[in-house]
Amino acid sequence: MAVALAGLARSLHALDWERCPFDRSLVVTVPQAARAVAEGSVDLEDLDEEREGWSGERLLAELERTRPADEDLAVCHGDLCPDNVLLDPRTCEVTGLIDVGRVGRADRHSDLALVLRELAHEEDPWFGPECSAAFLREYGRGWDGAVSEEKLAFYRLLDEFF
């Protein structure tokens, strides 16, 4: 599954982002996050473990403090995780995508952050650290960049607002 997900991510990220009509870059998503805090729509009961108990204001302050200076724009799914990818069980080939409401041009780390978080879950019998490592190996075959741990952390934080 990790190899199929990596191939999907690589294919999406290889599309011409300049032709994508949907903007999910930080000039759009950070103000949306601030609006979510102001409206009280951030689900503070469903935060990642390292942020349990945080207020919306604290989340937003951390988001602003850690905002990356640059973006490696690509066409992104926006919520790339195994639950949103349909696979043929016989061939393990991707047959479709669901939950595509956040598709748009964004930093590729926004997809990488979410899929790697999901694949690394040790308590899930289907996944674990070896799955995220396999994903990175396969994804890296078609990309000359480097994964930024700081950006991964930032985009996981940004996901808390949506």
Regions found by a protein language model. Give the residues of each.
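An alpha-helical support segment within catalytic cores of ATP-dependent transferases
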Residues: A2, G7, S11-G78, D144-S148
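Short runs of predominantly hydrophobic/aromatic residues within well-ordered alpha helices
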Residues: A2-L5, H109-L112, F154
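Glycine-rich, flexible loop segments associated with nucleotide phosphate handling
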Residues: E50-W54, C92-G96, P129-A133
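Active-site activation/catalytic loop segments of kinase-like enzymes and analogous catalytic loops
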Residues: S110-D144, R156-F162
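Alpha-helical scaffolds flanking conserved acidic
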Residues: S148-Y155
